[in-house]
Amino acid sequence: MFIKGVILSSYGVNGYARIKSISNNFCDFINLKNNKVLLKKSNGFAIEVKVIDVNIKSNSLFLKFEGIDAPESVKPLIGFELWVDDSLASSLKEGEYYLGKLIGYTIVNDNRKLGEVVAFFEYLNNVFLEVKVGIKFFFIPFLSIYIGNIDAREKTIELKVLDLLR
């Protein structure tokens, strides 16, 4: 499953939810119509809902969920993440990756295993991989100057600059 967006607010009087897209690609949301998605809160609470309408207006995205017909019903869902099945995830271009799928990949250099990706985070428009090496943790910028080949079959990520692990 992939996170596709976050509920920001209610919209209108018919129970639409205003959504922030994680990928900024609204077109892929059209495929959610008549499909079930999982709404998850950071505390672990989750509910499954069916998307019955997708609306894009003025660079904003709105979803209507089955059984939610008033703004008051949307308000408790604000902040929930919208998770979708892998088959409904946005398509990727060459060289693009779902960061969540990189968790568990092994960091390598010259075929030597160095550590494992345990998390990622974004800060000031940059993505960092959190890498565990022994009992220490390091943050590696997800930039081509530091990161080389990513092998999905072997689940490895080449680290070009070893000094990042000191």
UniProtKB/Swiss-Prot annotation:
Keywords: Chaperone, Cytoplasm, Ribosome biogenesis, rRNA processing. GO terms for biological process: ribosomal small subunit biogenesis; rRNA processing. Residues 94-165 form the PRC barrel domain. GO terms for molecular function: ribosome binding. Signal peptide: none annotated. Pfam families: PRC_RimM, RimM. It is found in: Cytoplasm. Transmembrane segments: none annotated. GO terms for cellular component: cytoplasm; ribosome. The keyword rRNA processing applies. It comes from the Bacteria. The PRC barrel domain binds ribosomal protein uS19. An accessory protein needed during the final step in the assembly of 30S ribosomal subunit, possibly for assembly of the head region. Essential for efficient processing of 16S rRNA. May be needed both before and after RbfA during the maturation of 16S rRNA. It has affinity for free ribosomal 30S subunits but not for 70S ribosomes. Belongs to the RimM family. Binds ribosomal protein uS19. This is Ribosome maturation factor RimM. It comes from Borreliella afzelii (strain PKo) (Borrelia afzelii). The gene is rimM.
